[in-house]
């Protein structure tokens, strides 16, 4: 169950989508049950209760696909290094007020839970002093703790992120050893309240999005290859909504696409 503020504030959902995917070319236009993937994502965003749903892309084909299914679409530059940069351009184009809440719904998440989208928006609205909100869930599988592709987050007493890392954090000094021969030999993780897996869903205040492009890339962001560390490096606080509902995975590879297509009967 997702725990968040029960009062849903007005918010805008933006679905950034780009065609230039190395592992899965033309990913936003991949057919899923008779509709392009980007449309499936936008539909989930609409189900979240967002006041407005926008598809943002540098590809006319993506914009045309979104508009053909009744969604508003906006053209963005092709040189954005991240989805956050693309959102920043959209925020600048629309001139949203500083307190407007904008949720980044990644364009390769056709199975995203609409309640989680709404949840991070509500969580940000309830988290004064934070410019960003995201989500996480407890880790119970030892293999996930030691998997660098699983991003971990450590929280403070108020549920604000202390750090995100691909490393196993926090390190259980008395339980872990530097190396194990195999996953089966790894110990049970510390209490689930301590070890959390980050979920790549973000809500932002428009004021932050306007300042984001001017923030210098940080050393820790480069080392970890985690763009959220740029905001933390520059002193921004990130509120974390903890959910016990493990989200379904997104689409990164042809195998992922086949799995999702099967769910939709493609």
Curated annotation (Swiss-Prot):
Keywords: Cytoplasm, Lipopolysaccharide biosynthesis, Nucleotidyltransferase, Transferase. Its EC number is 2.7.7.38. Pathway: Nucleotide-sugar biosynthesis; CMP-3-deoxy-D-manno-octulosonate biosynthesis; CMP-3-deoxy-D-manno-octulosonate from 3-deoxy-D-manno-octulosonate and CTP: step 1/1; Bacterial outer membrane biogenesis; lipopolysaccharide biosynthesis. It comes from the Bacteria. HAMAP family: KdsB (MF_00057). PANTHER family: 3-DEOXY-MANNO-OCTULOSONATE CYTIDYLYLTRANSFERASE, 3-DEOXY-MANNO-OCTULOSONATE CYTIDYLYLTRANSFERASE, MITOCHONDRIAL. This is 3-deoxy-manno-octulosonate cytidylyltransferase. It comes from Paraburkholderia xenovorans (strain LB400). The gene is kdsB.
């Amino acid at each position: 169950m997702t725990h968040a503020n029960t009062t849903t504030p007005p918010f805008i959902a933006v679905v950034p989508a780009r065609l230039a995917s190395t592992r899965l070319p033309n990913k936003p236009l991949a057919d899923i049950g008779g509709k392009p993937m980007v449309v499936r994502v936008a539909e989930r965003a609409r189900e979240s209760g967002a006041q407005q749903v926008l598809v943002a892309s540098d590809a006319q084909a993506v914009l045309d696909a979104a508009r053909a299914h009744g969604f508003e679409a906006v053209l963005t530059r092709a040189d954005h290094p991240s989805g956050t940069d693309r959102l920043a351009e959209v925020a600048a184009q629309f001139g949203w007020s500083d307190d407007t809440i904008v949720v980044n719904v990644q364009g390769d998440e056709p199975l995203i839970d609409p309640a989680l989208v709404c949840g991070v928006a509500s969580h940000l609205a309830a988290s004064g002093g934070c410019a960003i909100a995201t989500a996480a869930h407890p880790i119970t599988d030892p293999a996930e703790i030691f998997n660098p592709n699983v991003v971990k987050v450590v929280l403070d007493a108020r549920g604000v992120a202390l750090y995100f890392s691909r490393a196993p954090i926090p390190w259980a000094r008395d339980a872990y050893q530097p190396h194990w021969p195999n996953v089966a030999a790894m110990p049970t993780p510390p209490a689930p309240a301590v070890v959390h897996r980050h979920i790549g869903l973000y809500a932002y205040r428009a004021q932050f999005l306007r300042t984001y492009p001017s923030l210098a890339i940080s050393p820790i962001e480069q080392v970890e290859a985690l763009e959220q560390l740029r905001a933390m490096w520059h002193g921004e606080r990130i509120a974390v909504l903890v959910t016990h509902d493990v989200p379904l995975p997104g689409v990164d590879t042809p195998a992922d696409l086949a799995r999702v297509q099967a769910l939709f009967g493609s």
